Amino acid sequence: AGYVIFFIDKKNNTLWLDYIAIFKEHHSKGFGTRIFEAMKKEFFEFSGVWLEVEKPDENEPDTLRRRKFYKKLGARIVSENYIYPNNNGGLSMDLYFLPFCEENFAKKMHKCVKTAFETIHSDVENIEKIIDKIK
């Protein structure tokens, strides 16, 4: 139905979307949303994903559709003065950020609590049962 290419930035705990393509016959069927849901699930420890987005162009409806899609996912515009580097001096784009942590906060919190409890309170009996009660 499509594919995605992204860069894993472990140093900054984020992803960078390089390219996403959903074949035309699969547009508006939820495949793009499923790709991002899979990324969030796989990389839930990461803060989120950076999206380099073309400026809106009424003559190019796909640019408008992409922007609407990213906003629907929860992406926020971070910079309208972003320059995508290329050998022609750069391309003016907008930079969006789609946070993963808000949606996956409960999972992340549980993982952090588990690590802290197992380290700090390792002397407590049945620590696993206590951890499991925390939602």
Task: List the predicted regions and their residue ranges.
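A generic structural signal for beta-strand entry/edge sites
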Residues: 12-14, 48, 93
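Conserved N-terminal glycine/acidic-rich loop preference
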Residues: 13-18, 58-75, 113
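A short, internal acetyl-CoA/4′-phosphopantetheine-binding micro-motif in the GNAT/acyltransferase core
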Residues: 20-27, 55-57
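Conserved GNAT acetyl-CoA-binding A-motif
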Residues: 41-61, 65
